[in-house]
Amino acid sequence: MRTESELRKHPVQEARFFREGRGEADVLKILIVEDDAQLATTLKYLVEDNPRYLVVATADDLDGAVAAADQHAPHLALVDLQLARGSTGFSVAVRLGDFDVPCLFVSGKAPAFPMPDLALGCLMKPFTAEDVHRSLAMAEDLMRGRETLRPRQPPNLTLYDTVIGGEVDMQPGFIPSRRSLKTRLEHWIAGHQH
């Protein structure tokens, strides 16, 4: 069992799996939010290449993602940052947070700064089947609160929990979200207490 401070680090993910009685061997239900239909189909195929992962729905915008999360209760969402009908992956991640669904961004252009409040990390396009498999395994380890036993992180995957404690290179003019500011302040205070 994890300590209280460890649970605070990833409370949504930890609670979601064990509150519902899921064990280590259960299937991870995944929602794909991608507006390129061909890429969504390819990603679905790559994800389901591993029998431990099941794509329960695909969506191409915010409304579709919210409806799919409400209907299918996925454990993880793979979310593109630029979506159909003016939606963004950021807005999808915020709304999926209301359903306790953690996100892994999948994008051709990564955010210029880490967003641990919104996503576990970002897998950059283009990617290989091996990149997808390793990224899902590492995301699952984070969500289940396991130590990562996979030493080789794909070069195009950035996990935000590994950046939180360190210095973050902010772009000039960037203003983080209120939740992000609160999280960063809490980490700064925790790091400066003796």
Sequence positions of predicted segments:
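CheY-like receiver
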Residues: 8, 15-18, 134, 141-194
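Hydrophobic/aromatic residues positioned on beta-strands within the core alpha/beta folds
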Residues: 106-107
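Hydrophobic face residues on amphipathic alpha-helices
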Residues: 128-132
